């Protein structure tokens, strides 16, 4: 857990499916905004790197994406993303202005057990990037969204209806096919949850 940033997703108790959806939406928006601004990829968005703080259930957040102002609910949980050690981003205009971590230097990262979603996610990232870690490949963000949805379904216990569970399972499946967090933001599970307005 991070002192000022809240408790990590691994250790916090979610109260309901609305909190789970709001958490996923906030992570998706944050990644999509960073993709647009800096061609950002987190590349290590496991449960310990998603911090949650309790806030007012009616609190909303705002973000600017593609020239549009987005407003979206927290449902009582504010998200902070931490640990950018493995991340990739553009810091300028030239190829030499890319900050990234060469994950090939840590082969153990790819040797975790098959069927373990976090280990599988590292391997899926390697396949998506073709092992060229400086290259911008926002699909890695979508792969971590799939991972987070998987963890919500398999590792976290909170009340949800059959319909809410089906929505989460559907998002998990669709996230594997998305090319970016920006694309995931338009998922059926999120459409109608966030609002937009031209600035």
Regions found by a protein language model. Give the residues of each.
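Conserved structural core of kinase catalytic domains
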Residues: 1-20, 91-102
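Structural signal for hydrophobic/aromatic residues that build the beta-strand cores
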Residues: 2, 9, 27, 31-34, ...
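Amphipathic alpha-helical protein-protein interaction segments
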Residues: 13-20, 43, 74, 131-138, ...
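Conserved kinase catalytic-core helix
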Residues: 15-42, 47, 56-57
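C-terminal or late-domain output modules
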Residues: 30, 49, 54-69, 75, ...
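Short, flexible/disordered secondary-structure transition segments
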Residues: 38-47, 52, 57-59, 92, ...
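Catalytic activation segment of kinase domains across protein kinase-like and atypical kinase folds
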Residues: 41, 46-124, 128-131
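Helical subdomain adjoining the active site within ATP-dependent kinase catalytic cores
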Residues: 114-199
């Amino acid at each position: 857990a991070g002192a000022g940033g809240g408790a990590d997703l691994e250790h916090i108790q979610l109260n309901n499916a609305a909190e789970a959806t709001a958490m996923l939406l906030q992570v998706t928006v944050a990644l999509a905004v960073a993709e647009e601004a800096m061609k950002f990829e987190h590349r290590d968005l496991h449960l310990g790197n998603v911090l949650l703080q309790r806030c007012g259930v009616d609190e909303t957040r705002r973000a600017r994406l593609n020239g549009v102002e987005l407003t979206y609910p927290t449902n009582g949980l504010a998200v902070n993303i931490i640990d950018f050690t493995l991340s990739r981003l553009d810091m300028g205009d030239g190829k030499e202005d890319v900050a990234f971590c060469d994950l090939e230097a840590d082969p153990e990262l790819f040797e975790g057990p098959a069927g373990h979603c976090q280990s599988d996610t590292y391997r899926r990232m390697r396949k998506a990037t073709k092992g060229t870690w400086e290259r911008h490949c926002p699909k890695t963000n979508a792969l971590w969204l799939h991972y987070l949805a998987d963890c919500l379904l398999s590792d976290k216990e909170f009340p949800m209806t059959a319909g809410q569970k089906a929505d989460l399972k559907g998002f998990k499946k669709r996230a594997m096919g998305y090319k970016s967090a920006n694309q995931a933001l338009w998922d059926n599970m999120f459409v109608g949850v966030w609002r937009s307005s031209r600035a």
